[in-house]
Amino acid sequence: MPAFRLPVRQLVEFLLRTGSIDSRFTGFDRANEGARIHRKLQKAAGEGYAAEVFLSGEREAAGIPFTIEGRADGIFTDEAGVTVIDEIKTTAVPADDIAEDMNPCHWAQGMVYGALYGRQQGLEKLDVRLTYYQIDTDDILRFVRHFTLEELEAFLQDLLEQYAPWAQRQLAWKEQRGVSLSALDFPFPAYRPGQRALAGEVYRACTAAPSKSGVRLFCQAPTGIGKTMSVLFPALRAIGTGCGEKLFYLTARNTTQSAAEDAIARLRASDSKLALRSVTLTAKEKVCLHPDAEGHPACLPELCPYANGYYDRVNTALKALLDDGTGRFDRAALADAAKQFTVCPFELGLDLSEWCDVIIGDYNYLFDPVVHLRRFFDSAGDWLFLVDEAHNLPERARAMYSARFCKSSLTEAKRALGRGKSTLKTALSKADKAFLEGRKAVSTLAPRRGSTVAEEDDSGQTSLPGSAETPAIELPAADYAQDGTVFCKELPSALLAPLRALTAPLQDWLEADPDAEAHAALLDLYFEVQDILRASERYDEHFAAQLTARGSDLELQLLCLDPSPFVDASLSAGRAAALFSATLTPPGYYRTVLGCPEARAVALESPFPAENLGLYCLPSISTRYRQRDASIRPISDALAALASSRVGNYLAFFPSYAYLRQVWEDFTAHYPDIGTLVQESGLDDAGRAAFLERFSPCPEKTLLGFGVMGGIFGEGVDLAGDRLIGCAIVGVGLPQVSPRQEMLRRYYDAQNGAGFDYAYRWPGMNKVLQAAGRVIRTQEDKGVVLLLDDRFAQSEYARLFPKHWRHLEYLRDTKELKKKLAEFWGE
């Protein structure tokens, strides 16, 4: 029987943790502050103190061989010659309330390390010391207990005996899973064209010899071939051969998680003996069963019954779920179990994930530096990553590593705090003044065009943007300064220093006044400050600082221009990663931006008959900003020609809501007999579903939907058959020119001379190709794609078209378009 690998912390916390979930403010970032203070204490301990000592030992309980391993915070020999295991804990608990028996898990960790080290070194006795560091006062409290090795071994053996049934359950499951997955058959009678090739690529990547940074694969496969099954099936087969312990299926949006759930359900339906556990992780805000009056999770034991006593009941819930045989733990199943056992569904999903084979969730569970799953990704593991809709990852990753902070947050906090003097009020005023001076500096460097409106600061004084008044602080050299926006390559330390100084008094106030009326506002401020300070610690040559003056406000953004090193580090936590999408063109762009320049990239051709796709372009129309007014009527006429060619459902995609609205108003005025539907901004899940329901099969009347490229209907929407028979794409999808996009352009110009491509052309064309992919979803589908922009005829754009667009026809005018559409539909 193979040894059961068991981290010390997992063993101890699983068996001994008790009590409630309590998310009240504790005054420090546990992950970052705890690690920093550990290093501080370890360094202060001197040369004879061995820090972060890796320990591993073999033990047996209930016939199960265990490998127990972990890192002891410190090991040293005291003046009496006794070996001491030091367990360091950072706490916000007041020093007077820190007790020796405050948390049994703390002693247990030290005792297990003592057992491992004592046997390894042949010791007869040793001490365990708990070192508590109080983060507010810097007080250090130490407690020491004396043990014989026999006592420590007995303690460890007792823990293992308690854990043995869980280990036996998991070992039996892994054996059953291995047999099941190694014999897993493809769940359809035959592969669709392209599916076998894609599955083969993914299988080879997952089963390749492990490397330090993991194997990377980029797969571009046409919409409609069944990509989800084509990547899931081979990855599961790889796990069946022993290549990979868990599979993480990562998506850009919740709506695409259902595709993975459905694929796994199909596998279960085709194989009644399939041994597979899958869990879908959903944001806490969406699954909370007991939100507060404002609809937010209230994770406090006195407010939420699902948080109160959570750790006393969660293992009972886990046992019931793992033994029920279904293996499918989606949002609904977790909610049902949470209600049955009175446990938090969000935390239950996280705890259940350690016992599951497939984990489905958002990108941020792997890539976000704040919310990634530390239980899996703080160190490398035998994980397989499937990254769906990978064309979305560059922008999502940039957002994850960026941060913003506004002067108005300081103003609102001061207002919430009210009158009176305090250390916090002084720190707030200093930070507010620094941002006021920063706003003056920005307005001086980059006055807004035509701005003459007087701006009032918090003291009631007024100044004019761009006035000659000399700011009291100096910003770093500007790389860009125009119309109220300044970009700097260096960090604006003069703004960050007062925010850093604000942290301690803000923490003290939040801890001292948890019931104050201003607590919520100041807690929001605290998190905003921490977010920008964390980003400043990551800040390097891949970032730029953006300062924007708007009225009396100043916005500071630390923008991640190039997320490649951070994405690379995240992917390195696993054995293999397959990043796939219908649109990864050009592949070199995505490999570079996502930190995988040497990765294998494959592009599969469309298996669908070319004659089923009518593909036309009207290059006589220019949608450039300066020609937009002139383009509105020709676009309306072209859309009318498309929608009148055959009764059915159509979509027209635009680069912006404003442009969409202009054309829609003109279209409905001139073609009132054609039914229309407009995508509104900010649609929730219900609004999205209602929009799509209008695209019914076998329509008796024509419906033309107006949507936005890159939005919720421009990708990830499956309207097969006659639910959608045509789409028009207005423009080449270029992002709006902005200071941010210009900084991206400059950055990549300096990197490789392709700044316009990286910042504008390639992201824009990705939106175009995604929108066009809504039309043909199956072998039987037939439909039309109409491109409206003269740039589609330029080689820089045309070379980005997929190979199955070879038959694209460029037409002179709407009259010729009507003729071609009639021929296509045979009417």
In which residue ranges do the predicted regions lie?
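Metal-dependent nuclease catalytic cores that hydrolyze phosphodiester bonds in DNA/RNA
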Residues: M1-D78, A108
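Conserved pre-motif I regulatory segment
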Residues: W173-Q220
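A substrate-engagement module of RecA-like helicase motors
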Residues: G178, D185, C243-I359, F367, ...
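Signature of the SF2 helicase/ATPase Hel1-core->accessory helical subdomain module
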Residues: V231, R237, S258, K339-V358, ...
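A contiguous, basic/glycine-rich beta-loop/short-helix subdomain that forms a polymer-engagement track
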Residues: L334-I359, P369-F376, P505-S622, A630-I632, ...
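Conserved RecA-like P-loop NTPase helicase motor core
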Residues: P619-A630, S681-F792
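Conserved helicase motor "Helicase C" RecA-like lobe of SF1/SF2 P-loop NTPases
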Residues: P655-E680
